[in-house]
């Protein structure tokens, strides 16, 4: 069984086809401008001596502070997907006996300040998360990907040509 990563849960909320393709090792993201920008943001933080990425099990957490697990994103284009990604990370930490709150920092390209969202793994969110994880497992175990549904964000996706051309 595939271990569900932060990327997979993010893709599940963003696009079921993308989630299935990524989980089944059809990776076209090396050609994605957005993926490159995200990697550069992490590299810049590393160069400034702020290397804070932490690996726990099969997930990579951007940063942990005294009170928060922090996830950094370049834009707030899909905050719901990021929320569930952070809830997964909080759940993984809880399984290790570490209780934190989630903090999502969106670094907007053309704005002076960053947007910050907060999330907590309460009983309701944890129950929903476990249901989502079961649904993701069902999805990625399908023999073929679900049919792609065109959305506005598809044009910027690394899988656009695979799905629509």
Place the predicted regions along the sequence by residue:
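Metal-dependent nuclease catalytic cores that hydrolyze phosphodiester bonds in DNA/RNA
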Residues: 1-69, 73-80, 84-87
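Cysteine-cluster motifs in flexible loop/terminal segments that predominantly coordinate metals
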Residues: 15-19, 143-165
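Short helix-capping/linker segments at secondary-structure and domain boundaries
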Residues: 20-28, 93-100, 165
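Short, charged low-complexity intrinsically disordered segments located at boundaries
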Residues: 39-43, 50-52, 118-124, 158-165
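Short, flexible, glycine/charge-rich loop motifs used to bind or transfer phosphoryl groups or to couple energy/partner
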Residues: 53, 60, 92, 144-147
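Nucleic-acid nuclease catalytic cores
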Residues: 56, 64-140, 161
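Broad gene-expression machinery/nucleic-acid interaction feature
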Residues: 60, 101, 154
């Amino acid at each position: 069984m595939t271990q569900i990563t932060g990327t997979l849960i993010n893709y599940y909320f963003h696009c079921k086809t993308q989630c299935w393709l990524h989980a089944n090792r059809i990776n076209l993201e090396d050609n994605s401008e957005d993926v490159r920008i995200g990697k550069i943001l992490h590299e810049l933080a590393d160069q400034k001596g702020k290397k804070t990425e932490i690996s726990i099990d099969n997930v990579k957490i951007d940063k942990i502070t005294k009170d928060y697990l922090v996830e950094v994103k370049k834009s707030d284009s899909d905050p719901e997907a990021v929320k569930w990604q952070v809830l997964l990370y909080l759940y993984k930490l809880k399984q290790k006996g570490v209780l934190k709150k989630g903090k999502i920092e969106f670094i907007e390209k053309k704005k002076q300040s960053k947007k910050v969202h907060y999330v907590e793994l309460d009983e309701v969110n944890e129950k929903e998360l476990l249901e989502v994880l079961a649904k993701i497992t069902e999805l990625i175990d399908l023999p073929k990907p679900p049919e792609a549904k065109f959305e506005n964000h598809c044009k910027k996706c690394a899988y656009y040509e695979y799905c629509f051309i």
